[in-house]
Amino acid sequence: MKKEIVTNENGIIKILNEFGITKPILEEASKMDINVPMLFYDKIINNPSAENIDNVTKNLLGVYGNYYATHYFKMQGYDVENEVGVYDNGNLLTRADISFIDSNGVRNYCEVKAAYQIIDNIRNYKDNSLEKTGYYKNLDAEIIKYKKIGEKLIKQVKKLSKDGSLVNVIIFDGCYMDEIIKQELKNLDANIITLNVNIYDLEENIKKNVLRILSYFSKNVTINIDYKGKKNR
Protein backbone atom coordinates (compact mmCIF):
# COMPACT_ATOMS: atom_id res chain seq x y z
CA MET A 1 0.00 0.00 0.00
CA LYS A 2 1.37 3.37 -1.04
CA LYS A 3 1.93 5.74 1.87
CA GLU A 4 0.29 9.16 2.02
CA ILE A 5 2.84 11.98 1.82
CA VAL A 6 2.21 14.89 4.19
CA THR A 7 4.17 18.05 3.38
CA ASN A 8 2.49 20.68 5.53
CA GLU A 9 0.64 21.25 8.78
CA ASN A 10 -2.74 21.07 7.06
CA GLY A 11 -1.98 17.48 6.15
CA ILE A 12 -1.52 16.61 9.83
CA ILE A 13 -4.69 18.52 10.72
CA LYS A 14 -6.65 16.55 8.12
CA ILE A 15 -5.60 13.27 9.72
CA LEU A 16 -6.26 14.55 13.25
CA ASN A 17 -9.75 15.57 12.10
CA GLU A 18 -10.36 12.03 10.88
CA PHE A 19 -9.58 10.79 14.40
CA GLY A 20 -11.98 13.23 16.06
CA ILE A 21 -9.55 16.01 16.94
CA THR A 22 -11.60 18.55 15.06
CA LYS A 23 -11.59 22.31 14.56
CA PRO A 24 -13.26 23.22 17.92
CA ILE A 25 -10.62 21.24 19.83
CA LEU A 26 -7.77 22.70 17.79
CA GLU A 27 -9.15 26.22 18.34
CA GLU A 28 -9.43 25.62 22.09
CA ALA A 29 -5.83 24.41 22.13
CA SER A 30 -4.70 27.46 20.18
CA LYS A 31 -6.23 29.73 22.82
CA MET A 32 -4.10 27.84 25.35
CA ASP A 33 -1.01 28.41 23.18
CA ILE A 34 -0.82 24.72 22.25
CA ASN A 35 -0.18 23.89 18.61
CA VAL A 36 -1.66 20.39 18.43
CA PRO A 37 -0.31 19.46 14.95
CA MET A 38 3.20 20.49 16.01
CA LEU A 39 2.76 18.65 19.30
CA PHE A 40 1.98 15.44 17.42
CA TYR A 41 4.82 16.08 14.99
CA ASP A 42 7.38 16.60 17.77
CA LYS A 43 6.24 14.01 20.29
CA ILE A 44 4.37 11.31 18.38
CA ILE A 45 5.50 11.24 14.76
CA ASN A 46 9.20 11.95 15.28
CA ASN A 47 9.81 10.43 18.71
CA PRO A 48 6.97 8.18 19.90
CA SER A 49 8.31 7.26 23.34
CA ALA A 50 6.09 6.32 26.26
CA GLU A 51 7.02 9.61 27.92
CA ASN A 52 6.02 11.62 24.86
CA ILE A 53 2.75 9.72 24.45
CA ASP A 54 1.99 10.62 28.06
CA ASN A 55 2.98 14.25 27.42
CA VAL A 56 0.61 14.56 24.47
CA THR A 57 -2.18 12.84 26.40
CA LYS A 58 -1.79 15.25 29.33
CA ASN A 59 -1.75 18.27 27.03
CA LEU A 60 -4.91 17.09 25.29
CA LEU A 61 -6.54 16.34 28.63
CA GLY A 62 -6.13 19.99 29.55
CA VAL A 63 -7.48 21.09 26.18
CA TYR A 64 -10.54 18.86 26.41
CA GLY A 65 -11.07 19.98 30.00
CA ASN A 66 -11.22 23.62 28.92
CA TYR A 67 -13.40 22.69 25.95
CA TYR A 68 -16.00 20.90 28.07
CA ALA A 69 -15.99 23.64 30.71
CA THR A 70 -16.42 26.34 28.06
CA HIS A 71 -19.29 24.40 26.51
CA TYR A 72 -20.91 24.03 29.95
CA PHE A 73 -21.04 27.77 30.55
CA LYS A 74 -22.11 28.56 27.00
CA MET A 75 -25.04 26.20 27.52
CA GLN A 76 -25.98 28.32 30.55
CA GLY A 77 -26.33 31.25 28.17
CA TYR A 78 -23.15 33.09 29.11
CA ASP A 79 -20.95 34.97 26.68
CA VAL A 80 -17.73 33.11 27.41
CA GLU A 81 -14.16 34.25 26.82
CA ASN A 82 -11.06 32.08 27.15
CA GLU A 83 -7.56 32.81 28.42
CA VAL A 84 -8.51 36.25 29.71
CA GLY A 85 -5.82 38.40 31.26
CA VAL A 86 -6.20 39.34 34.93
CA TYR A 87 -4.38 42.54 35.86
CA ASP A 88 -3.09 44.16 39.02
CA ASN A 89 -2.31 47.88 38.75
CA GLY A 90 -2.00 47.53 35.00
CA ASN A 91 0.35 44.55 35.16
CA LEU A 92 -0.64 41.10 33.90
CA LEU A 93 -1.04 38.92 36.99
CA THR A 94 -2.33 35.71 35.42
CA ARG A 95 -4.86 34.41 32.90
CA ALA A 96 -8.26 32.92 33.61
CA ASP A 97 -9.15 29.77 31.67
CA ILE A 98 -12.71 31.07 31.32
CA SER A 99 -14.37 34.41 31.99
CA PHE A 100 -17.97 35.62 31.75
CA ILE A 101 -20.44 38.07 33.28
CA ASP A 102 -23.22 36.31 35.19
CA SER A 103 -26.91 37.27 35.40
CA ASN A 104 -26.14 39.52 38.37
CA GLY A 105 -23.60 41.48 36.37
CA VAL A 106 -20.68 39.97 38.28
CA ARG A 107 -17.45 39.07 36.53
CA ASN A 108 -16.65 35.36 36.92
CA TYR A 109 -13.24 33.80 36.44
CA CYS A 110 -12.87 30.03 36.13
CA GLU A 111 -9.89 27.80 36.77
CA VAL A 112 -10.28 24.43 35.07
CA LYS A 113 -8.52 21.42 36.60
CA ALA A 114 -8.64 18.23 34.54
CA ALA A 115 -7.00 16.14 37.25
CA TYR A 116 -7.54 12.87 39.10
CA GLN A 117 -7.02 14.47 42.48
CA ILE A 118 -6.57 17.89 44.06
CA ILE A 119 -5.03 17.37 47.43
CA ASP A 120 -3.08 19.28 50.04
CA ASN A 121 0.56 18.70 49.18
CA ILE A 122 1.71 17.66 52.66
CA ARG A 123 -0.98 15.02 53.03
CA ASN A 124 -0.61 13.72 49.53
CA TYR A 125 3.00 12.57 49.40
CA LYS A 126 5.74 11.52 51.76
CA ASP A 127 9.26 12.97 51.47
CA ASN A 128 8.52 14.14 47.93
CA SER A 129 8.97 10.55 46.75
CA LEU A 130 7.03 8.66 44.09
CA GLU A 131 5.41 6.43 46.71
CA LYS A 132 1.82 7.23 47.67
CA THR A 133 0.33 6.45 51.04
CA GLY A 134 -3.03 6.45 52.77
CA TYR A 135 -6.05 7.01 50.59
CA TYR A 136 -4.05 7.03 47.39
CA LYS A 137 -2.01 3.82 47.53
CA ASN A 138 -4.27 2.02 45.03
CA LEU A 139 -4.49 4.84 42.52
CA ASP A 140 -2.58 4.81 39.27
CA ALA A 141 1.07 5.86 39.58
CA GLU A 142 0.54 8.57 36.96
CA ILE A 143 -1.32 10.60 39.58
CA ILE A 144 2.01 11.54 41.16
CA LYS A 145 2.35 14.16 38.43
CA TYR A 146 -0.42 16.11 40.13
CA LYS A 147 1.17 16.25 43.56
CA LYS A 148 1.51 20.03 43.56
CA ILE A 149 -1.79 20.78 41.89
CA GLY A 150 -3.52 21.74 45.14
CA GLU A 151 -0.88 24.28 46.06
CA LYS A 152 -0.89 25.76 42.57
CA LEU A 153 -4.69 25.91 42.54
CA ILE A 154 -4.86 27.93 45.75
CA LYS A 155 -2.23 30.38 44.48
CA GLN A 156 -4.14 30.80 41.22
CA VAL A 157 -7.49 31.37 42.94
CA LYS A 158 -5.89 34.08 45.08
CA LYS A 159 -4.70 35.83 41.92
CA LEU A 160 -8.05 35.47 40.15
CA SER A 161 -9.98 36.87 43.12
CA LYS A 162 -7.64 39.81 43.70
CA ASP A 163 -9.94 42.30 41.94
CA GLY A 164 -13.08 41.03 43.69
CA SER A 165 -14.30 38.83 40.84
CA LEU A 166 -16.15 35.62 41.62
CA VAL A 167 -13.97 32.53 41.12
CA ASN A 168 -15.19 29.10 40.07
CA VAL A 169 -12.99 26.01 40.22
CA ILE A 170 -14.05 23.48 37.60
CA ILE A 171 -13.30 19.81 38.22
CA PHE A 172 -14.57 16.58 36.69
CA ASP A 173 -16.47 13.53 37.82
CA GLY A 174 -14.08 11.11 39.52
CA CYS A 175 -11.72 13.83 40.76
CA TYR A 176 -10.96 13.56 44.48
CA MET A 177 -10.54 16.86 46.30
CA ASP A 178 -9.59 16.64 49.96
CA GLU A 179 -11.20 18.63 52.76
CA ILE A 180 -8.18 20.87 53.30
CA ILE A 181 -8.35 22.19 49.74
CA LYS A 182 -12.13 22.50 49.91
CA GLN A 183 -11.86 24.58 53.09
CA GLU A 184 -9.17 26.82 51.62
CA LEU A 185 -11.34 27.44 48.56
CA LYS A 186 -14.31 28.17 50.80
CA ASN A 187 -12.21 30.68 52.73
CA LEU A 188 -11.43 32.37 49.42
CA ASP A 189 -15.17 32.44 48.50
CA ALA A 190 -14.50 30.22 45.47
CA ASN A 191 -17.18 27.90 44.11
CA ILE A 192 -16.45 24.30 43.16
CA ILE A 193 -18.30 23.02 40.08
CA THR A 194 -18.06 19.36 39.07
CA LEU A 195 -18.78 18.57 35.43
CA ASN A 196 -20.46 15.30 34.51
CA VAL A 197 -17.50 14.04 32.49
CA ASN A 198 -15.48 11.26 34.12
CA ILE A 199 -11.82 12.25 34.29
CA TYR A 200 -10.55 8.65 34.16
CA ASP A 201 -12.62 7.76 31.10
CA LEU A 202 -11.65 11.01 29.40
CA GLU A 203 -7.92 10.45 29.80
CA GLU A 204 -8.18 6.78 28.83
CA ASN A 205 -10.07 7.65 25.65
CA ILE A 206 -7.60 10.41 24.76
CA LYS A 207 -4.63 8.08 25.23
CA LYS A 208 -6.25 5.35 23.13
CA ASN A 209 -6.84 7.89 20.38
CA VAL A 210 -3.25 9.12 20.55
CA LEU A 211 -2.06 5.53 20.11
CA ARG A 212 -4.42 5.01 17.18
CA ILE A 213 -3.09 8.16 15.53
CA LEU A 214 0.49 6.98 16.13
CA SER A 215 -0.31 3.63 14.53
CA TYR A 216 -1.90 5.32 11.52
CA PHE A 217 1.05 7.64 10.93
CA SER A 218 3.53 4.78 11.35
CA LYS A 219 1.80 2.54 8.83
CA ASN A 220 0.28 4.93 6.32
CA VAL A 221 2.06 8.29 6.26
CA THR A 222 5.39 9.72 5.16
CA ILE A 223 6.10 13.10 6.76
CA ASN A 224 8.13 15.79 5.01
CA ILE A 225 7.61 18.96 7.04
CA ASP A 226 10.11 21.56 8.24
CA TYR A 227 9.03 23.01 11.58
CA LYS A 228 12.42 24.65 12.05
CA GLY A 229 12.32 27.65 14.33
CA LYS A 230 8.90 26.87 15.73
CA LYS A 231 8.39 25.86 19.32
CA ASN A 232 5.72 24.06 21.25
CA ARG A 233 5.16 23.15 24.88
Give the label of every model feature segment.
Residues 112-194:
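Catalytic cores of nucleic-acid endonucleases
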